């Protein structure tokens, strides 16, 4: 098996179904739920037939449309046979440059051991969705390599038919253009997606950080008899102005959209979020809901929207979903009240990574046994820490850390940090390979600098991309408090006051930034 949780390479990929779905003790309750979830007229368990569901559904509880941890999930048909996951690789990632100079956004390293793409793929696998496509276009080489190494062999699922496959943008006689947007990317591969005998398509982004049970999301879609279900994040007034907001009716049906509203337009988008399951006190703090860019779309609806109703639409969020609402389709909101971060900018990426070091509870935890995050098994040795002072930090596999100080930082794979170095509030991405002793000796003879952090260097509030060579006595502390600077020829950029050293860059000894 070519995939593993970083902390436990031997773990089974597809976690077993929840005991409630397979044990005799819970069979009666699950049969009841299956009848509710089954499509109209479809035979349920034990020969029973589900009653036709009216277009205006009866809500058994507001929790039916929220990500409640206490709710029970019994999908029929099972997600492994009835849902196709489609992960969008994203655009050129210009706001994340220079991290996207040589890689696609979803391939950007995350949390010492992982890459961004591991998040949606792991969420799918943990939700029993094992048929997954990843659509890519820009700088796809490292993303393709990671996916093939991490998820290339059989990954289980129904009759061991699971897969994670990369679909690259391509030109054809019928369509000479590259992907023009999220909807266009899906449209160009509809011929392939249509071949799968599934009920729904699950549309996901490849650059979000969150942990979500998609089975509950899909169950809500079926229970409400929706054509489209949109994952929604509760928002307070301060954050709401930066997002696309949605307004819902008393049944949780989306009736209006507004992109980054302000003033009176913002107030007009207030909703009663208790409809979606929030407690009264929290609902008062969070009176807005924002789209997460995550959708469950019934198969026949997707084909109709992209081929017939909106054949020229390029984007789901700004064109297809509002268009479907305007034509009278049932577009439901599904509340996700957990940590979620769109890794769209250098600042957001930096904060998301350092957030995993937060005490006592990190913003996002990679240590959840019930829903692990999988990645490529690299078979690296344990990290070696020699006479170092390390506090409030996360250290990846295979690092060599000598007599230095590391505080509130994330240290990536194969990082080498020399004596006397000080690393504070920093993300080190590490290296793709080790240099041999012979390599280092040859470099020293030529006056070169090995991969890693040199002696007595001081790095604060920075991102050091992979394979960077930082010499001795280097200061990366933004001494002039510069907020924006593009010094690519010198090996670094500054965005939002954060210094980002480019992949494979070389900073000579004594450099001061």
Swiss-Prot record:
Which organs or tissues contain this protein? Leaves and starchy endosperm.
Activity modulation notes = Activated by 3'phosphoglycerate, inhibited by orthophosphate. Allosteric regulation.
Q: Does the keyword Electron transport apply?
A: no
Q: Which reaction does it catalyse?
A: alpha-D-glucose 1-phosphate + ATP + H(+) = ADP-alpha-D-glucose + diphosphate
A Pfam family matched by this chain, by name?
A: LbH_GLGC
**Complex and partners:** Heterotetramer.
Question: Could you tell me the EC number(s) of this protein?
Answer: 2.7.7.27
| Gene Ontology CC | amyloplast; chloroplast
PROSITE patterns registered for this protein in UniProt: ADP_GLC_PYROPHOSPH_1, ADP_GLC_PYROPHOSPH_2, ADP_GLC_PYROPHOSPH_3
Tell me, in a sentence or two, what this protein's role is: This protein plays a role in synthesis of starch. It catalyzes the synthesis of the activated glycosyl donor, ADP-glucose from Glc-1-P and ATP.
The annotated pathway is: Glycan biosynthesis; starch biosynthesis
Instruction: State the name under which the record lists this protein.
Output: Glucose-1-phosphate adenylyltransferase small subunit, chloroplastic/amyloplastic
Cross-referenced SUPFAM superfamilies = Nucleotide-diphospho-sugar transferases, Trimeric LpxA-like enzymes
Q: Which family does it belong to?
A: Belongs to the bacterial/plant glucose-1-phosphate adenylyltransferase family.
- PANTHER family associated with the record: GLUCOSE-1-PHOSPHATE ADENYLYLTRANSFERASE LARGE SUBUNIT 1, CHLOROPLASTIC-RELATED, GLUCOSE-1-PHOSPHATE ADENYLYLTRANSFERASE-RELATED
Q: Which UniProt keywords apply?
A: Allosteric enzyme, Amyloplast, ATP-binding, Chloroplast, Nucleotide-binding, Nucleotidyltransferase, Plastid, Starch biosynthesis, Transferase, Transit peptide
Q: Where is the transit peptide?
A: 1-64
**Known Gene3D superfamilies for this protein?**
Hexapeptide repeat proteins, Spore Coat Polysaccharide Biosynthesis Protein SpsA, Chain A
Q: Cite the GO molecular-function annotations of the record.
A: ATP binding; glucose-1-phosphate adenylyltransferase activity
Origin species: Hordeum vulgare (Barley)
């Amino acid at each position: 098996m070519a995939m593993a949780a970083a902390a436990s390479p031997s773990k089974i990929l597809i976690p077993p179904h929840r005991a409630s779905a397979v044990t005799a003790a819970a069979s009666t309750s699950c049969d009841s739920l299956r009848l509710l979830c089954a499509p109209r007229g479809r035979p349920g368990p034990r020969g029973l037939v589900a009653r036709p569901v009216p277009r205006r559904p009866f809500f058994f509880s507001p929790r039916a449309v929220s990500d409640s941890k206490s709710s029970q999930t019994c999908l029929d048909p099972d997600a492994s046979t009835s849902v196709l996951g489609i992960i969008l690789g994203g655009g050129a990632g210009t706001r994340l440059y220079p991290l996207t100079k040589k890689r696609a956004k979803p391939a950007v390293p995350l949390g010492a051991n992982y890459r961004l793409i591991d998040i949606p793929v792991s969420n799918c696998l943990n939700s029993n969705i094992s048929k997954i496509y990843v659509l890519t276009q820009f700088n796809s080489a490292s993303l393709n390599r990671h996916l093939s190494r991490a998820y290339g062999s059989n990954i289980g699922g129904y009759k061991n038919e699971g897969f994670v496959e990369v679909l690259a943008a391509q030109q054809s006689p019928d369509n000479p253009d590259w992907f023009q947007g999220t909807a266009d990317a899906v449209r160009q591969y509809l011929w392939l997606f249509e071949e799968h005998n599934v009920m729904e398509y699950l549309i996901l982004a490849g650059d979000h950080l969150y942990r979500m049970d998609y089975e509950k999301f899909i169950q809500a879609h079926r229970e409400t008899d929706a054509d489209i279900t949109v994952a929604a994040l509760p928002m307070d007034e301060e954050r709401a102005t930066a997002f696309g907001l949605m307004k819902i009716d008393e049944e949780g049906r989306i009736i209006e959209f507004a992109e980054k509203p302000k003033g009176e337009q913002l107030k007009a988008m207030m909703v009663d979020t208790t409809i979606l399951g929030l407690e009264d006190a929290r609902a008062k703090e969070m009176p807005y809901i924002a789209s997460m860019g995550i959708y469950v779309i019934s198969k026949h609806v997707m084909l109709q929207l992209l081929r017939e109703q909106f054949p020229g639409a390029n984007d789901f969020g700004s064109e297809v979903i509002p268009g479907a609402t305007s034509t009278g389709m049932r577009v439901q909101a599904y509340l996700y009240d957990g940590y979620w971060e769109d890794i769209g900018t250098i600042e957001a990426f930096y904060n998301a990574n350092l957030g995993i070091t937060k005490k006592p509870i990190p913003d996002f935890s990679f240590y959840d046994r019930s829903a692990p995050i999988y990645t490529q098994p690299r078979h690296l040795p344990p990290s070696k820490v020699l006479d170092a002072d390390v506090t409030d930090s996360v250290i990846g596999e295979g690092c060599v850390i000598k007599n230095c100080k590391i505080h509130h930082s994330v240290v990536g794979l194969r990082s080498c940090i020399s004596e006397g170095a000080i690393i504070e509030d920093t993300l080190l991405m590490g290296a793709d390979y080790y240099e041999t002793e012979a390599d280092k000796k040859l470099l020293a003879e030529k006056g070169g600098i090995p991969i890693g952090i040199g002696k007595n260097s001081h790095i604060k509030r920075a991102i050091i991309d992979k394979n960077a060579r930082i010499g001795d006595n280097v200061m990366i502390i933004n001494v002039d408090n510069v907020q924006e600077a593009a010094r690519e020829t010198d090996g670094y950029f500054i965005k939002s006051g954060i210094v980002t050293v480019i992949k494979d860059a070389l900073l000579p000894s004594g450099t001061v930034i």
